Swiss-Prot record:
This is Arginine--tRNA ligase. PROSITE patterns: AA_TRNA_LIGASE_I. PANTHER family: ARGININE--TRNA LIGASE, CYTOPLASMIC, ARGINYL-TRNA SYNTHETASE. CDD domains: Anticodon_Ia_Arg, ArgRS_core. A motif ('HIGH' region) lies at residues 143-153. SMART domains: Arg_tRNA_synt_N (SM01016), DALR_1 (SM00836). Monomer. SUPFAM superfamilies: Anticodon-binding domain of a subclass of class I aminoacyl-tRNA synthetases, Arginyl-tRNA synthetase (ArgRS), N-terminal 'additional' domain, Nucleotidylyl transferase. It comes from Prochlorococcus marinus (strain SARG / CCMP1375 / SS120).
């Protein structure tokens, strides 16, 4: 009800200023305004909205809250625009004002959504002020080359994808970046080791697969930790890379490409669109970071290293912690690369991305790292006042024992294996149900449905949790047909698709909607919340709010369909109720799509 709220708030604000002109003028001089505190009603019996500002305004207006409410109501009742939106207001308690929307207002809003691909969600570029919006960068997934994607990458990948989808839906230009770990000491170790055990892999594509590459990396890391000579050789290889040695760069490119192929298989399965821009991209800009921080007077030399001491972030000794920008040996680290990335991303095109907002989706363990990096970027004055950089942290994926999810042998769970298991379990469940119902379906149907449900279950189980907290991973819970799960929502979409097939396409045939049953109005009000939920998720970056809304909408719809006739109703009720079914289906499908979840017509 975002548009209704905006219009209503405008009328209430105007009425408040007209009713109390002296107080309005007084607060305006101090740069403030009389705030009516218009909010969504907390309970259905309080109507649709509540004006809660009378108690706070009493101190300014010098009247009792109830007197203020009575005067404001009188002013509102003389406003024709307000009366077209709301029924006569009611005072509750010491001065709260309850507002209930006119049925005609609700019907007009529902009618407009029936023919609106955006389902009432306003585009940011509809506003003249925001026509020159800068791009938004969402930095997510970011696996390391020569390592397989594991369950820890799941959260960053699907949370980041959902955030990017929602921002794009609102009209922002979104740049999806995969900041892969494609540079550094690990490549020196790996190349040095492969020169001895698999030299062909450094000159020829597809000689080894990623699984073998991971094992080679583990062995290289072990040798690096135990053998000083190997350690020195590895560092020399890193120097060769940094100097642009052709053989070293060829080997590096082959290793990156091998990993990239495997990453893309996962992204294809999850339907993730993302542009790779690894750490190596920012190598040419690292010296610029040093130069900028030196000019700004932020860079300090400490024990041979160049660092910036952070404000308000102290170590155990009570002294400010340093953010190391350049090590004593002249090398750079993650913080330097992240600063170079921020600097590049905020610079205007063509020298950078020209971003107005950068969102980093990583685990909460990196919160302190980003707090330090963001602080330095702000103190260096790289961040314009109109721009934002944000860390979107998330908790751990745990097993049902409450510990970090691991395989039986204690290894980190590979993301590929987790997806395979989800699809396999979904397939077994589908085959069992088909057998119980004595239904015959093609193998292609079973494969498509099991793949869709399996992937959807994994995504939704994660996204439906508050991302800040840890959550316990359970195949049984996520694949259940009851409760706040993907299968439950997918079944609701399938149910509506079946109703629509029987009822026909009504988007163009319903001329005038008319409703009388409480179940209809309850569903209408729930449908109209979609826009405000999307706007809230855009600001708070909490996809679980959208999940909760879709679950509530599906429950409200099921009660509506179970309690009153739809297909067997008399006209015009039949067509009007079918229109609500169709709009509910569209809303559920769009909401699931914004979570990166595909839907089905049949299950």
């Amino acid at each position: 009800m975002y548009n209704i709220y905006k219009s209503l708030n405008q009328q209430v604000q105007r009425a408040l200023n007209t009713a109390f002109p002296e107080a309005a003028s007084q607060v305006k001089e101090s740069g403030d305004f009389l705030n009516p505190q218009l909010v969504a009603a907390t309970k259905p019996e309080f109507g649709d909205f509540q004006i809660n500002g009378a108690l706070a305004l009493a101190r300014i207006i010098k009247k009792s809250p109830r007197q203020i409410a009575e005067i404001l109501i009188k002013q509102l009742e003389s406003n024709e625009v307000f009366k077209a939106i709301c029924l006569p207001p009611e005072i509750a308690g010491p001065g709260f004002i309850n507002l209930t929307l006119q049925n005609t207002c609700l019907i007009n809003e529902i009618t407009s959504r029936l023919n609106d691909d955006l389902l009432g969600v306003p585009l940011v570029n509809d506003d003249e002020i925001t026509k020159k919006l800068k791009p938004v960068i969402v930095d997510f997934s970011s696996p390391n080359i020569a390592k397989e994607m594991h369950v820890g990458h799941l959260r960053s990948t699907i949370i980041g994808d959902s955030i990017a989808r929602i921002l794009n839906y609102r009209g922002y230009k979104v740049i999806r970046l995969n900041h892969v770990g494609d540079w550094g000491t690990q490549f020196g170790m790996l190349i040095t080791h492969l020169k001895e055990v698999a030299p062909k892999a450094l000159t020829t594509a597809n000689v080894i697969n990623l699984g073998n590459l991971v094992e080679f990396y583990k062995k290289a890391k072990q040798r690096f930790d135990e053998d000083e000579y190997f350690q020195q050789c590895s560092r020399n290889e890193v120097v060769n890379l940094q100097r642009g040695n052709k053989e070293s760069l060829k080997a590096w490119e082959l290793l990156c490409e091998q990993s990239r192929k495997e990453f893309n298989k996962i992204y294809d399965r999850l339907k993730i669109e993302i542009s790779e821009r690894g750490e190596s991209f920012y190598n040419p800009f690292l010296q610029g970071v040093i130069d900028d921080l030196t000019r700004s007077g932020l860079l300090v030399e400490d024990d041979g290293a160049k660092c910036v001491f952070l404000n308000g972030i102290n170590g155990k000794d009570g002294n400010p912690l340093p953010l190391i920008i350049q090590k004593a040996d002249g090398g750079f680290n993650y913080a330097t690369t992240d600063l170079a990335a921020i600097r590049y991303r905020l610079k205007d095109q063509p020298d950078g991305d020209g971003a107005g907002r950068i969102i980093y989706v990583t685990d909460s363990g990196q919160a302190n790292h980003f707090a330090g990096v963001f602080q330095v970027a702000k103190r260096a004055k790289w961040l314009p006042s109109s721009s934002r950089i944000e860390h979107v942290p998330f908790g751990l994926v745990q097993g049902e024992d409450g510990k970090k999810l691991k395989t039986r042998s204690g290894e980190t769970v590979r993301l590929k294996d987790l997806l395979d298991e989800a699809i396999s379990r979904a397939k077994l469940d589908i085959e069992r149900r088909l057998n119980e119902e004595n239904r015959k379906e093609s193998q292609a149907f079973i494969e498509k449905v099991s793949n869709t449900i399996g992937i959807a279950a994994v995504k939704y189980a994660d996204l439906s949790q508050n991302r800040i907290t840890n959550y316990q991973f359970s195949f049984d819970r996520m694949l259940a047909l009851q409760g706040n799960t993907a299968p439950y929502l997918l079944y609701a979409v399938v149910r509506i698709a079946g109703i629509n097939r029987k009822g026909g396409d009504l988007h163009s045939s319903v001329n005038k909607l008319n409703f009388s049953e409480p179940q209809e109005w309850r569903l209408i009000r729930e449908l109209l919340k979609f826009d405000e939920v999307i706007i809230a998720v855009e600001e708070e970056l909490l996809p679980n709010r959208l999940c909760n809304y879709l679950f509530e909408l599906s429950q409200v719809f099921n009660r509506f369909y179970d309690q009153i006739p739809v297909l067997k109703a008399e006209e015009p009720s039949r067509s009007c109720r079918l229109a609500l079914c169709q709009l509910t289906g569209d809303t559920l499908k769009k909401g699931l799509n914004l979570l990166g979840i595909s839907t089905l017509e049949r299950m």
